[in-house]
């Protein structure tokens, strides 16, 4: 669900306008969050369908769209809605929704910036639900380099797909900004984190990666030579 904050500066407008050009050149799959009325039309501009689990029972037309997306040969990524809810959707209910929607991929319930709880949830979920349809996406979580590094190592070994978020607090320390802007810290912070994984020799070039959200579209030019970064929402 690509979201851009309103800014007075021209460079932010340029950032937005250049987004489609950047992503077309890189071949990263993109899905924008859209109003329900535009879901059908979104097939024309979204490379895949990104489904928020907490909306499935709130909006019948929302559920209908995603339940029948495969008729149109669409990839569907089912999110556990942790960003929207502040905590992951109940694991048992989430598994039921996976069985109902039959997504191409689904994000296993995680815990915001908590590596231990995320890995515990991942292990419990994968042991409890062994025959769900679709590929498993594990999210990297943590507050420090060591936590994020260790979580990445485990998730990249155990999940089918690795997700890295755009707004870890860690980025506010490692990122750079000429204007003390949080968006710039997040943008450069995730770039640096991925560079660190590559420099340490642990980045899995043989496994697809998903970028959860973004702050500034300029970030993605940094990944032009990293085809393992496959998608963004």
Label every PLM stretch briefly:
Residues 10-13, 17:
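Short hydrophobic targeting helices and cationic amphipathic motifs
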Residues 18-22:
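Short, positively charged and aromatic/hydrophobic N-terminal segments
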Residues 23-41, 95, 107, 127-131, ...:
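Alpha/beta catalytic cores of nucleotide-metabolism and tRNA/nucleoside-modifying enzymes
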Residues 23-131:
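Non-catalytic, usually N-terminal nucleic-acid engagement modules in DNA/RNA processing proteins
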Residues 47-49, 73, 102-104, 156-162, ...:
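Glycine-enriched alpha-helix->loop->beta-strand junction motifs that scaffold or abut catalytic
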Residues 79, 138, 223:
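Conserved, mostly hydrophobic/aromatic
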Residues 112, 141-212, 216-218:
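Glycine/Thr-rich beta-alpha phosphate-binding loop at enzyme active sites
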């Amino acid at each position: 669900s690509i979201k851009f904050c309103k800014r007075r500066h021209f460079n932010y407008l340029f950032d937005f306008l250049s987004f489609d050009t950047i992503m077309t050149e890189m071949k990263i799959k993109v899905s924008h969050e859209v109003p329900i009325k535009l879901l059908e039309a979104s097939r024309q501009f979204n490379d895949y369908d990104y489904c928020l689990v907490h909306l499935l029972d709130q909006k019948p037309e929302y559920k209908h769209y995603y339940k029948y997306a495969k008729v149109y040969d669409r990839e569907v990524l089912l999110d556990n809605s942790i960003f929207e809810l502040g905590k992951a959707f109940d694991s048992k209910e989430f598994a039921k929704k996976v069985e109902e929607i039959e997504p191409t991929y689904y994000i296993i319930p995680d815990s915001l910036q908590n590596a231990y709880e995320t890995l515990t949830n991942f292990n419990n979920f994968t042991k409890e639900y062994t025959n769900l349809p679709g590929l498993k996406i594990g999210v990297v979580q943590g507050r420090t380099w060591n936590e994020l590094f260790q979580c990445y190592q485990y998730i990249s070994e155990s999940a089918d797909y690795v997700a890295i978020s755009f707004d870890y607090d860690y980025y506010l320390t490692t990122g750079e900004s000429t204007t003390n802007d949080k968006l710039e810290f997040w943008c450069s912070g995730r770039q640096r984190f991925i560079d660190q994984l590559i420099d340490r020799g642990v980045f899995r070039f043989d496994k697809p990666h998903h970028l959860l959200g973004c702050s500034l579209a300029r970030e993605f030019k940094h990944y032009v030579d990293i085809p393992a970064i496959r998608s963004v929402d």
